[in-house]
């Protein structure tokens, strides 16, 4: 089993930057804002054939109210999960009272702890680190995480007692069905994730946009593996002023591309707004399978529920293939019914059919409804084959098929959907016109032969006229 290493420290000491250096990614949002990382964030890492899991935590601050206190509780949870703790301090800021308080708590845990002094660049390291010996954790390991300096030496020290992997490929674990939960800020995404997981895993605070980063959470249900991706809420671009929110939008779009199925969460009480439609548009551009969850359905009047249903039917008419569920993430109503739709969408998105079967369906469709004519010549569709999955892509070859009008494309899409009962996924149809191998070639016959052909043609036409008389 992979060991778990937790990065612990007060806010803004550089834990997220160090996390990125260790995991070789930008998986944690990094900016010069105290308390930016608001939730535990897991990342797989490998160093010198040793695999481990890194947990990036929110800072343990001095505030005892609001979200800062809640984040402190999340950090304590990460400490309990960890096999090794990296206690990060700021060499530039020096030793603070909150560092000493954290050190006292860590010493009571009986776990292996490594003191790491970050931001040693630009300071006299030996002088700056003297005061940290007061913590009683030995000599601090020196790093400059923003530049990657000292990180390798730190990992060698931290991982010295961890055995090498017998086979690194065994650690490329199957993440199962990857499920991205997306939506505007404060529509209940994190509450839905917590309900699906059955634990208070993601910070769900009554503040818009409490989850700024995308969080990957592996779990199992009824013997099936999943990875839940809880994304930051996407705001309208006009309101995205802070660098943090810009990072979050990018992370949400990346999470969509990484997911197999996207669950779009909509607030029933606020109704469907343009940003909900834009978000669905992003998912369609990514070609992702989709399930719609209309959340906060509880405590609505019968009239409001009726109006909401009418609004859903009207505004979502461009995705008739998407399953729509009315749920209450807070109370769990309807949440369990999401899974069958998720599974059906996943299976539809990963359709695999032989070229022979697809071509037969194509022939039946064109026999029932002939393709239109283009410039006096009818479009001829010869054969079809799969071009990919998620979304299912069907490639059709023939003559002038690239001229196929939109309404006939929709007809073919509906035929394939009906035959294979495709639900919850867009279907992409591509057309490839067969090239004429002789196009552009000049005639190789000499003038004498060409003249003889012309005489034969003239004689044939005269004979044809006499026959008609």
Curated annotation (Swiss-Prot):
Binding site for GTP 2: 183-190, 230-234, 295-298
Molecular functions per Gene Ontology: GTP binding; ribosome binding
NCBIfam families assigned to the protein according to its UniProt record, in alphabetical order: GTPase_EngA, small_GTP
Family listed: Belongs to the TRAFAC class TrmE-Era-EngA-EngB-Septin-like GTPase superfamily. EngA (Der) GTPase family.
SUPFAM superfamilies found in the cross-reference section: P-loop containing nucleoside triphosphate hydrolases (SSF52540)
KH-like domain segment(s): 351-435
One example of a Gene Ontology biological process annotation: ribosome biogenesis
Function: GTPase that plays an essential role in the late steps of ribosome biogenesis.
Domain EngA-type G: residue ranges: 3-166, 177-350
UniProt keyword Nucleus present: no
Gene it is expressed from: der
Binding-site positions, GTP 1: 9-16, 56-60, 118-121
Keywords assigned: GTP-binding, Nucleotide-binding, Repeat, Ribosome biogenesis
UniProt-recorded name of the protein: GTPase Der
Subunit structure as annotated in this protein's UniProt entry: Associates with the 50S ribosomal subunit.
Taxonomy, superkingdom: Bacteria
